[in-house]
Curated annotation (Swiss-Prot):
This is Prefoldin subunit alpha. The gene is pfdA. Transmembrane segments: none annotated. GO terms for biological process: protein folding. Heterohexamer of two alpha and four beta subunits. One of its GO terms (cellular component) is cytoplasm. It is found in: Cytoplasm. Its main location: cytoplasm.
């Protein structure tokens, strides 16, 4: 007769089940970490999109300013325009001088500058913001690439 202990195979099975449980738990943790990383990347993408949208809004405003400035310096002297005074209200005003522009220099400080100088300053701000936008778009592209690399791993690990 065999002197084998009948409880031995049960212990082996129990140990094997315990090991599978540890691996499953480790797999669950890995999936959770991958999902957390994915959520973080998606949040960063959303933040960058918001930043790009804000930069685009400022660029659009600057282009509009440039367009109005160009028109007024060429055609505006003596014209009557509607000046916004807030809350959808306007007042008529006659343009007398198109040679200078009052421009904000920050901190509630404004400065009177020649129109051509104001135009150059606006163009310079547009160029700088377009560089910022390009940098943000590159970062967005990189994050999208990371998400596209991570998604298959999340699906693969999550399916196990």
């Amino acid at each position: 007769m065999s002197s084998a202990n009948p409880s031995r195979p049960v212990e082996g099975v129990a140990e094997e089940k315990a090991q599978v449980g540890v691996e499953a738990k480790g797999g669950e943790e890995k999936v959770k970490l991958l999902q957390d990383e994915l959520r973080s990347l998606l949040a960063q993408i959303e933040y960058l999109r918001d930043q790009i949208e804000a930069v685009n809004t400022v660029i659009d405003d600057l282009y509009a300013s440039l367009e109005v400035l160009d028109y007024l310096t060429k055609e505006g002297k003596g014209k009557v325009v509607l000046v916004p005074i807030g809350a959808g209200n306007f007042i008529k005003a006659k343009i007398e001088d198109t040679n200078t522009v009052i421009t904000s220099v920050g901190g509630r400080l404004s400065l009177e500058v020649p129109s051509d100088e104001a135009k150059k300053a606006i163009e310079s701000r547009i160029a700088a913001l377009e560089q910022v936008r390009l940098t943000l778009l590159r970062k967005l592209e990189e994050l999208n690439r990371k998400v596209n690399e991570l998604l298959p791993r999340v699906r693969e690990e999550g399916g196990q």
